[in-house]
């Protein structure tokens, strides 16, 4: 099964007070052209769809246009909110969107549930995990000892056990320890928000957002795709990632 893994669109972003919306629409059009030329079975949007929790109306219209274009191509879309997004705003209309196979992570209320896809090899379960903070997880499991981002993610994934007979894809938006950050990302003091890559070991592919540089972390199938549009000089030369998952075993 083949997915296009995208993240960190940051729609509505301004760089030095210059609106990037025209450039963002251009890159989304290029992505649609890529999808027309290279068919995929689904699109993964790993958070930071917008640049701000309250995006400008033009950014909302641009995301609406992009999701509509994906839906008209009969492509299932799997989207989560990132740290720049308002989870409530991103999740608005999620039940209605699901009727068009546009699956959006709800506001965090517990362990994500699988969304199944079928192909000739069997079932692929997609799990949507929006950006997590420790307080969110403590609210759901108040008796758990959660002091850090790592504790929070570990708690959630203890309650989310993929079916070993299915291929599994997790879409998440966290900073994984050992990954390389770029200058345009929000700084973290002392890596306080980092999580251990080993926490994701139960999943065959982990589609990460948050960091703007495309990279793997540890294994080949734990990846940041990077941002499709560049927001700093340190991001020059980056490209999109096209992910192909074809077997029920980890690759």
Residue ranges and their predicted role:
Residues 1-68, 72, 170:
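N-terminal active-site segment of His-dependent metallophosphoesterases
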Residues 8, 28, 48, 63, ...:
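Divalent metal-coordination and catalytic microenvironments
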Residues 41, 76, 103:
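Residue-level detector of anion-binding/catalytic polar loops
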Residues 55, 84-221:
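His/Asp/Glu-rich metal-coordinating catalytic cores
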Residues 71-79:
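Short, surface-exposed connector motifs at secondary-structure boundaries
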Residues 209, 227-231, 239-242:
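Glycine-rich, charged/polar anion/phosphate-binding loops
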Residues 216-219, 234-238:
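Short glycine/proline-enriched turns and hinge-like loops at secondary-structure junctions
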Residues 243-251:
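Residue-level detector of conserved catalytic or cofactor/ligand-binding positions
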